[in-house]
Swiss-Prot record:
<feature type="transmembrane region" description="Helical">
    <location>
        <begin position="891"/>
        <end position="913"/>
    </location>
</feature>
<feature type="topological domain" description="Cytoplasmic">
    <location>
        <begin position="1004"/>
        <end position="1021"/>
    </location>
</feature>
<feature type="topological domain" description="Cytoplasmic">
    <location>
        <begin position="914"/>
        <end position="943"/>
    </location>
</feature>
<keyword id="KW-1133">Transmembrane helix</keyword>
<feature type="topological domain" description="Cytoplasmic">
    <location>
        <begin position="412"/>
        <end position="430"/>
    </location>
</feature>
<comment type="subunit">
    <text>Part of a tripartite efflux system composed of MdtA, MdtB and MdtC. MdtC forms a heteromultimer with MdtB.</text>
</comment>
<feature type="transmembrane region" description="Helical">
    <location>
        <begin position="849"/>
        <end position="871"/>
    </location>
</feature>
<dbReference type="InterPro" id="IPR027463">
    <property type="entry name" value="AcrB_DN_DC_subdom"/>
</dbReference>
<feature type="topological domain" description="Periplasmic">
    <location>
        <begin position="30"/>
        <end position="335"/>
    </location>
</feature>
<feature type="transmembrane region" description="Helical">
    <location>
        <begin position="336"/>
        <end position="353"/>
    </location>
</feature>
<keyword id="KW-0997">Cell inner membrane</keyword>
<protein>
    <recommendedName>
        <fullName>Multidrug resistance protein MdtC</fullName>
    </recommendedName>
</protein>
<dbReference type="Pfam" id="PF00873">
    <property type="entry name" value="ACR_tran"/>
</dbReference>
<dbReference type="GO" id="GO:0005886">
    <property type="term" value="C:plasma membrane"/>
</dbReference>
<keyword id="KW-0813">Transport</keyword>
<feature type="transmembrane region" description="Helical">
    <location>
        <begin position="944"/>
        <end position="966"/>
    </location>
</feature>
<feature type="transmembrane region" description="Helical">
    <location>
        <begin position="360"/>
        <end position="379"/>
    </location>
</feature>
Length: 1021
């Protein structure tokens, strides 16, 4: 009583307290960062190593395995995967959430150093690492195009000047430059000319290497001067290499130009990048795991004018893709929805109270509670994201509830003739415990969420804390500011209502009277209502499930898979064909893509869609339409998926979800993977089924006759060196320039390597100086070979990726895969498990029931403590089954799967619908204790007295959530499952709990009386 009086009779202090809360909230709002979702990125580090010309199996055994053994000992590694392809190995380390990325990076460098002695000596450089997840979609893609500069020169500008500068920007984790390679001098040898001159490929390599050296020459001094010695020991361009003497034949000089074509070109000619049908160099920028995407993009954009000045004017630097516009639009949509929700909630209050003066009070309480929450969000290190803003939108209906309960009770005393200050004090005292019970029990719902681990826990923590803080501030405001404003603003007389609102008032009175009559009948037929309640509890609704709603971020990512033996020239043609099909789609704004490098048979595409207001289809509908057109393209497949704000795991795949096969027996894995993949491809629950196992590449298998080699004076080292020199794009020398280092690349001229007959033209110089054709001591035949070798941990692995067809959920796909694996009878040597997002989905589904039970148990404990009763909390919790059924029916009606967002809605319903029961039970207990009423009379009176605030609070929550259900702008697919569950649950529970709660109350009261009828014991001294 004194607590309430302190604020009611000191209006200045109360107002200033509220102003202070509001000012702190405004300051916090201005400093809050903006993001699509809470920070939930796993710390990921990518280790890269190269050995040009080495086969995938060689890279896996000699490079990947030693590194994996060393890296696997690092603390906090939750997953380690690797992929080895031609001349390249990439190892992805995913760490626990609480692992500091910088500390992990130091451990990774130490592990690389420890494994260095076990790696091949021929590696051109030490393994390197990057603090970025390669499976994440780039946050921005920049393109360089020019009509005057070559692709190699553009790549040089991009990798030498732009990429290092961008990498230094706060938040940038990796800048991947694609579309070509660094400039180089390429030496294309003519086999017949070499044979005619008696020159071996090793002779050419040695001559070039010896002719281009960079060594210190020292200095000369006399008594007064010092001269630095400088020589022309370096060759920089193709024109300088052309006249180089590499051999003497019969006294005549054999120059490089006599046996080779020397050109200024690039290190790897098997690379191509394009943007909208034009050759381009791509800079794909990824953020650090802990970085804020909006701040990082803004920093990059601010740097672009400076970057443009560092490159020639003839080079066009453009932004081909930017993830931030749709994120900003989505957040703006939520902010607008929040404002609409506040307006609708205040309108509900006005319609019920029919007094402008009374409506001002909750109209002040709502913004104070919401704005004050921003201060706590800033102190907790949160951001303005879709989930935190959704929490505030939902909180609109909650924070007004407390003010409504207090205001309505005070208004009832005023209408009865009590003086304003006395009514404020008496009314607040009567409902203070009710408001406290509602708020604490609502906050209690979120305690299990705060204790939840893993990605779901991280994802939901900001939502739970934001909503809890808003409810806490609302509780404070409703017990301080609201009664003070009621005491000083409201009048003792019954307010005059406007004529146009009298109809609503009469309707409300009629509704209350009708409810009273129906409630009397219900209380006389409690068994029938009990059967209805039990039937609701027993109702089982089967609904599809998924991890996270499929978002439309306006960006698509596509992976190209062609025949594994395809040539680079053919693959480049496929890329161009696919890009044309996509570019012609009316919903597409921009297309970029690249292919080549160590994976000639694959490529990547990034597609930017037009803004939502310029297209009528969702991203998934566009994918479905394009899938039909792309299927007509022979010889290759393009798998499209919508880029999501959440992607789990470090695997790069061509689809959204992954199923990984592991085995310690590589042969068994290669035998069963095609069988499993083909089986999964037939399932209607899956789409775009593909695999990262590429073991059907074309290989030319050479078998040496060692006896013949020994007789001819040739060793294996010389033969292998021949093949590497001829076909390995061997980097044989380095050209040093002020800004970068470039390579001299030697190979047989591509004109002479169009078919396997090129091997017949190869020869080795033996120890007697004679040219011995390769065919003298080797036989060859075509065979299949792996284009990549994949590991997870230290086991051989193959990942099958898939998307979901329209109308199918992740739970459908998961169940179908489990059935298929059982039907196939896969041996125990091959183990299958979901990976990435699908794995988190499995873990989340297993914990959902426990989470809901924990929330209900927590609420029961809190209510039991508040009411000092085991029974009354059960009465209050009896409202939950109808709400849960209503939520699931609503999801079924809107064809929405049960996702993590829908789970939040269920948790919220646990907190929302029990408010009705709390108000009824609270007043019924008070009437029984002090009004000498029977339980039936008490609960009947409580239901009638609390009918208006129950309707007000329920409609406030309903209208607070309604704008999110009806919104269709950016990010709506993320928000709607939450609101659908809340609206469906509220409608169903409102229809039932007004009748079932009194029945349950009377049932437990009779039960209590039955067990309390015990003979009294006498105590004797």
């Amino acid at each position: 009583m004194k607590f309430f009086a302190l604020f009611i009779y000191r209006p200045v202090a109360t107002i200033l307290l509220s102003v202070a809360i509001t000012l702190c909230g405004i300051l916090g709002f201005r400093m809050l960062p903006v993001a699509p979702l809470p920070q939930v990125d796993f710390p990921v580090i990518m280790v890269s190593a190269s050995l040009p010309g080495a086969s995938p199996e060689t890279m896996a055994s000699s490079v990947a395995t030693p590194l994996e053994r060393s890296l696997g000992r690092i603390a906090g590694v939750s997953e380690m995967t690797s992929s080895s392809s031609l001349g390249s190995t990439r190892i992805i380390l995913q760490f626990d959430f609480d692992r500091d990325i910088n500390g992990a990076a130091r451990d990774v460098q130490a592990a690389i150093n420890a494994a260095q002695s076990l790696l091949p000596s021929g590696m051109p450089s030490r393994p390197t690492y990057r603090k970025a997840n390669p499976s994440d979609a780039p946050i921005m893609i920049l393109t360089l195009t020019s009509d005057t500069y070559s692709q190699g020169e553009l790549y040089d500008f991009a990798s030498t000047q732009l990429a290092p500068t961008i990498s230094q920007i706060d938040g940038v984790g990796d800048v991947d430059v694609g579309g070509s390679s660094l400039p180089a001098v390429r030496v294309g040898l003519t086999p017949q000319a070499l044979f005619n001159q008696g020159v071996s490929l090793d002779d050419v390599r040695t001559a070039i290497s010896n002719a281009n050296v960079r060594k210190p020459q020292g200095a000369l001094e006399d008594g007064t001067h010092r001269w630095q010695i400088q020589t022309n020991d370096e060759l920089k361009t193709a024109a300088e290499y052309q006249p180089l003497i590499i051999h003497y034949n019969n006294g005549g000089a054999v120059r490089l130009g006599d046996v080779a074509t020397v050109t200024d070109s690039v290190q790897d000619v098997r690379n191509a990048g394009m943007t909208n049908a034009k050759p381009a160099i791509l800079l794909m920028i990824r953020k650090l795991p802990e970085a804020n995407i909006i701040q990082t993009v803004d920093s990059i954009r601010a740097k672009l004018p400076e970057l443009q000045e560092t490159i020639p004017a003839a080079i066009d630097l453009q932004i081909a893709q930017d993830r931030s516009p749709t994120i900003r639009a989505s957040l703006e949509e939520v902010e607008q929805t929040l404002i609409i929700s506040v307006a609708l909630v205040i309108l509900v209050v006005f319609l019920f109270l029919r007094s402008g003066r009374a409506t001002i009070i909750p109209a002040v309480a709502v913004p104070v509670s919401l704005i004050g929450t921003f201060a706590a969000m800033y102190l907790c290190g949160f951001s303005l994201n879709n989930l935190s803003l959704m929490a505030l939108t939902i909180a609109t209906g909650f924070v007004v509830d407390d003010a409504i309960v207090v205001l309505e009770n005070i208004a009832r005393h005023l209408e009865a003739g009590m003086k304003p200050l006395q009514a404020a004090l008496q009314g607040t005292r009567e409902v203070g415990f009710t408001v406290l019970s509602m708020s604490l029990s609502l906050v209690a719902v979120f305690l299990p969420l705060l204790l939840m681990g893993g990605l779901p826990g991280r994802l939901l923590r900001e939502f739970a804390v934001t909503l809890s803080v808003a409810i806490g501030i609302s509780l404070l405001v409703s017990l301080t500011l609201t009664p003070m404003m009621c005491g000083w603003m409201l009048k003792a007389s019954k307010p005059r209502e406007q004529k146009r609102l009298r109809g609503f008032g009469r309707m409300l009175v009629a509704l209350q009277q009708g409810y009273g009559k129906s409630l009397k009948w219900v209380l006389n037929h409690t068994r029938l209502v009990g059967v209805v309640l039990l039937g609701t509890i027993a109702l089982n609704i089967s609904i599809p499930k998924t991890f996270f709603p499929e978002q439309d971020t306006g960006v698509l990512m596509g992976g190209i898979q062609a025949d594994q033996s395809i040539s680079f020239q053919a693959m480049r043609g496929k890329l161009q064909d696919f890009m044309k099909i996509i570019r012609d789609d009316p919903a597409v704004d921009n297309v970029t893509g690249f292919t080549g490098g160590s994976r000639v048979s694959s490529g990547m595409m990034f597609i930017t869609l037009k803004p939502r207001d310029e297209r009528s289809e969702t991203a998934q509908q566009i994918i479905d339409r394009l899938r039909v057109k792309l299927a007509k393209e022979p010889g290759a497949n393009l798998f499209l998926m919508a880029v999501q704000d959440i992607r789990v795991g470090g695997r790069q795949s061509n689809a959204s979800y992954q199923y990984t096969l592991l085995s310690d027996d590589l042969a068994a894995l290669r035998e069963w993977e095609p069988k499993i993949r083909k089986k999964l491809a037939t399932l209607p629950e899956l789409a775009d089924v593909n695999s990262d196992q590429q073991d059907n590449g074309a290989e030319m298998n050479l078998v040496y006759d060692r006896d013949t080699m020994a007789r001819l004076g040739i060793d294996v080292q010389a033969a292998n060196s021949l093949l590497n020199n001829a076909f390995g794009q061997r980097q044989i020398s380095t050209i040093y320039q002020p800004m970068n280092q470039y390579k001299v690349v030697m190979e047989v001229d591509p004109r002479y390597t169009q078919d396997i007959s090129a091997l017949e033209k190869m020869f080795v110089i033996n120890n007697e100086g004679k040219a011995i054709p390769l065919s003298y001591f080797a036989k060859w035949q075509p065979a299949n070979a792996p284009l990549s070798v994949n590991h997870q941990g230290l086991s051989a692995a193959s990942t099958i990726s898939f998307n979901l067809p329209t109308g199918k959920s992740l739970s459908d796909a998961s169940a179908a895969i489990d059935r298929a694996m059982t039907q196939l009878g896969v041996p125990s040597t091959v183990r299958g498990s979901f990976a990435g997002t699908a794995q988190v989905f499995q873990e989340t589904m297993n914990s959902q029931v426990i989470l809901i039970i924990a929330a209900i148990a927590t609420v029961y404990i809190v209510l039991g403590i508040l009411y000092e009763s085991y029974v009354h909390p059960l009465t209050i919790l009896s409202t939950l089954p109808s709400a849960g059924v209503g939520a699931l029916l609503a999801l079924e009606l809107f064809n929405a799967p049960f996702s993590l967002i829908a789970l939040i809605g269920i948790m919220l319903l646990i907190g929302i619908v029990k408010k009705n029961a709390i108000m009824m039970v609270d007043f019924a207990l008070e009437a029984q204790r002090h009004g000498n009423l029977t339980p039936q009379e008490a609960i009947f009176q409580a239901c009638l007295l609390r009918f208006r605030p129950i309707m007000m609070t329920t409609l406030a929550a309903l209208f607070g959530a309604l704008p999110l259900v009806l919104s269709g702008g950016d990010g709506s697919e993320l928000r709607q499952p939450l609101e659908i569950t809340i609206v469906g649950g509220l409608v169903m529970s409102q229809l039932l709990t007004l009748y079932t709660t009194p029945v349950v109350y009377l049932f437990f009261d009779r039960l209590r009386l039955r067990f309390s009828r015990k003979p009294k014991q006498t105590v004797t001294e």
